[in-house]
Amino acid sequence: YRKDGGTKKLYLAGKIRSDAIETLLGECQKETDGVCYQGYLETEEKYRMYAACSAFLFPSRAEGFGMPVIEALTYRKPVLVSDLPIFHEIAGDAVRYCKLDTEDAVPQLAAAMRQIEEDGKESIPESLCEAVVGRYKKERLAGGLKEFLETIGKK
């Protein structure tokens, strides 16, 4: 991405469960000024990063639900995720997808990053973000749970 003219820095966050990968990230940080490994972020810092970022990338190979995607959309950020069924289910057309199981996954990811940079924040209609985020608001989920429990209690 940066070799092809991309100007944004890549901030990596989260707990790495592999010493080898963590070592590799440390080496990568030393060799390029464009990669910054943040490690695990506390909630306040995580939300500050969402607010400050120009886009959110989530190239996960396996994902249970994908709450970080919903959180990034809450901040109306362009989101790029791996092409997994769970992301289609929760985010639909509000995010961009990238296949990670191909030989050219890295160039595809870099091209998608460049496209997001070119398009800017306008790359995703606000109405799509609002629709996705609205489905997962605490109030709505709590109401659905209450209704479910009341239905079970009547039987």
Question: For the regions a protein language model found, what residue spans apply to each?
Answer:
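Short hydrophobic signal-anchor/transmembrane segments that target glycosyltransferases
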Residues: Y1-T7, C28
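Nucleotide-activated donor-binding/catalytic signature segment of Leloir-type glycosyltransferases, i.e.
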Residues: G14, E22-Y47
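Short hydrophobic beta-strand element within catalytic cores of glycosyltransferases
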Residues: V69, T74, P78-V81
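A charged, aromatic-enriched C-terminal amphipathic alpha-helix characteristic of glycosyltransferases
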Residues: E122-I152
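Aromatic "clamp/platform" in nucleotide-sugar-dependent glycosyltransferases that forms part
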Residues: R61
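Short alpha-helical donor nucleotide-sugar binding micro-motif in glycosyltransferases
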Residues: R48-C53
